[in-house]
């Protein structure tokens, strides 16, 4: 793709590798930008080329720390002050998405706050993938293009996992809709893990609803953080007679001790996308790229085409 659509792609520190792959897919260079860090921990953003009147796409996942969010906000502000025409935030992993509602008294709703900050900074569109809660799209007053990791996962599953003995499973009731979509499109049964938590990242009890005896189980989730839920679900599947257990999840948050838990679990394979950089070496982890998916979304936004056909479900 040539650059006749008058657009430029830039990247924050956290997502540079993915942004480079997106640009390779688009056939355009990654835009030149400088992020200067100071001794006191502050940083400043400046564009090293003119973006006046251009449509800019700023690629940055807001994980693993608030610095990445602040960096993105400064990128947006600098683009607005440099007279960019349209400013699209491309956020492969939208951090704080698990703070999407008031589930107890006197608690913040982080996802809404982040949406307000991005909008106030000056974005005119958001492209993201597999939000933890679909309703977060409604927190924005600008268009939101919500992509799905299933677009790349389904191709991998069909090529590498025999469907005749496959069962799709969700590690918690909240993921039932997602797992049901996979089961429906693959034409296979679904089972559910029901869990109760003592507190965040700490599971009290888990049980299976459904039959996995002598089946190859595919656990489906959106985020793996400490990997406590996904590995406990895998172990439970094996205890209940599953022949093998693999898992897919869009976002590899993988906070310690997640990698160790995955390696020591009964999981045969753990498959993520590259929405978040995953630098650790874990023999069971496989990474699928979503660069082509985001590149196609950017291309269609620039040419005012529908992106609905990019959705697998």
Swiss-Prot record:
What is the active site of this protein?
A: 195
Which keywords accompany this UniProt record?
ATP-binding, Cytoplasm, Kinase, Magnesium, Metal-binding, Nucleotide biosynthesis, Nucleotide-binding, Transferase
UniProt cross-references to CDD domains, sorted A to Z = PRTases_typeI
Kindly indicate whether the keyword Ubl conjugation belongs to this entry: no
Q: Which pathway does the record list?
A: Metabolic intermediate biosynthesis; 5-phospho-alpha-D-ribose 1-diphosphate biosynthesis; 5-phospho-alpha-D-ribose 1-diphosphate from D-ribose 5-phosphate (route I): step 1/1
- The UniProt entry lists the main location of this chain as cytoplasm
Q: Any note on cofactor binding?
A: Binds 2 Mg(2+) ions per subunit.
Gene Ontology CC terms: cytoplasm; ribose phosphate diphosphokinase complex
- BP GO annotations: 5-phosphoribose 1-diphosphate biosynthetic process; purine nucleotide biosynthetic process; ribonucleoside monophosphate biosynthetic process
Q: Which cofactor does it need?
A: Mg(2+)
Enzyme Commission (EC) number? 2.7.6.1
Q: Which residues are noted in the entry as Mg(2+) 2-binding?
A: 172
Subcellular location per UniProt equals: Cytoplasm
Transmembrane recorded as keyword: no
One molecular function GO term is: kinase activity
> PROSITE patterns recorded for this chain?
PRPP_SYNTHASE (PS00114)
Q: Where does Mg(2+) 1 bind?
A: 132
Q: From what superkingdom does this record's organism come?
A: Bacteria
Residues noted as binding D-ribose 5-phosphate in the record, renumbered to the chain? 197, 221, 225-229
| Self-association state and partner proteins as the record states | Homohexamer.
Concerning its family, UniProt says: Belongs to the ribose-phosphate pyrophosphokinase family. Class I subfamily.
What the protein does comes down to: Involved in the biosynthesis of the central metabolite phospho-alpha-D-ribosyl-1-pyrophosphate (PRPP) via the transfer of pyrophosphoryl group from ATP to 1-hydroxyl of ribose-5-phosphate (Rib-5-P).
> Which HAMAP family does UniProt cross-reference here?
RibP_PPkinase_B
Q: Write down what this protein is called.
A: Ribose-phosphate pyrophosphokinase
Point out the gene that encodes the protein. Answer: prs
